[in-house]
A protein has these predicted regions:
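N-terminal "arm"/small-domain region of PLP-dependent enzymes with the aminotransferase-like
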Residues: 10-11, 15-73, 202
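Conserved PLP-anchoring active-site segment centered on the Schiff-base-forming lysine
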Residues: 117-136
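Active-site phosphate-binding strand-loop segment of PLP-dependent enzymes
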Residues: 150, 154-206
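Active-site PLP attachment segment
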Residues: 218, 224-260
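Structural signature of PLP-dependent enzymes
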Residues: 285-300
Length: 300
């Protein structure tokens, strides 16, 4: 059986390579940074999401080491069995304070956060209205949910309004958008989205993965840029880009939403907790963000 499947895969891979789409991994022989070593040569690095240069920050490295010394290397458990340390609750509180939200839930990655947010909250009676250029993790999360799907052209508010009109027959409606679209760097028009959400009785979800730490006067993301802190129902994001570039994702927002995700979000329920060292470094990172906006000033 595998011989036929092998031949099929070989042809598919050959087609990918012939189209110039085959992905080769670049092997880095140094810490992540503005300068990296590749094949023994020092190179300028313009392709990482290390927006604030924190991936090799000495304070975060020290915090991670201290966290491992104090709380161990790993958790070997999901959160609700025996995988929740005081560090995890501290980081969740720090994230909520940073974004001006009510509560936070941690995930292994933002892909998990986006993949696990819709199905626990919405049913076939409800509607998801999603930007056409949203991240793949949002697209996959929507596919896993039974809610009716509507799509509007990228940042096209006229099209969004038409989709909202069409979704008025549904029980609950949620508009979903990237804060910053990763492929072109455009910022979503969240002020206009929020106005339409109020007009058509819809909730809003924003993925702040590429905007948190970067957009806004103090790096609080697009909600800060548009003076909408605390007014958006759901925010998702990652610790894997501007916030140090390691691992970890989160959903932060209204308390009841976070409570329901703790009960029913499958990536949260069935994945190991974040490692203590990463959590400790995340706590220190948010402390740095609260102490100064020098990183943002240097970036801009």
């Amino acid at each position: 059986m595998y011989t036929k499947f092998q031949q099929h895969l070989q042809k598919e891979l050959a087609d990918i390579e012939a189209a110039g789409l085959y992905k080769n991994e670049r092997i880095i022989e140094s810490p992540q940074g503005a300068e990296i070593m590749v094949k023994g040569k020092k190179c300028l690095n313009f392709c990482a999401n290390n927006y604030l240069g924190l991936a090799d920050n000495p304070e975060l490295i020290a915090a991670a080491k201290k966290g491992m010394d104090a709380r161990g290397f790993g958790m070997a458990s999901v959160r609700f069995i025996c995988g929740c340390q005081d560090l995890h609750k501290q980081l969740e509180k720090k994230i909520a304070e940073f974004f001006g939200t009510e509560d936070t839930i941690l995930y292994a990655a933002c892909f998990d956060a986006n993949g696990g947010v819709f199905e626990p909250l919405l049913t076939e009676e409800d509607a998801i209205i999603s930007d056409a250029l949203n991240h793949a993790s949002i697209i996959d999360g929507v596919r896993l949910c039974k809610a009716q799907r509507y799509r509007y052209a990228n940042a096209d508010m006229a099209d969004l309004e038409e989709q909202l009109k069409a979704a008025q027959k549904n029980r609950f409606r949620i508009i979903v958008t990237d804060g910053v679209f990763s492929m072109d760097g455009n910022v979503c028009p969240l002020d206009k989205i929020y106005e339409l959400a109020n007009k058509y009785d819809a909730m809003v979800m924003v993925d702040e993965s590429h905007s948190a730490g970067v957009v806004g006067k103090t790096g609080r993301g697009v909600t800060e840029r548009y003076n909408l802190r605390g007014k958006i129902e759901i925010l998702t994001g990652t610790l894997g880009k501007a916030f140090g570039g390691a691992m970890g994702g989160f959903t932060t927002g209204k308390k009841e939403i976070i409570d329901m995700l703790r009960q029913r979000s499958r990536p949260y329920l069935f994945s190991n907790s974040m490692a203590p060292g990463l959590v400790a470094a995340g706590i220190r990172m948010f402390e740095l963000m609260s102490e100064t906006k020098a990183l943002q000033d240097n970036l801009h």
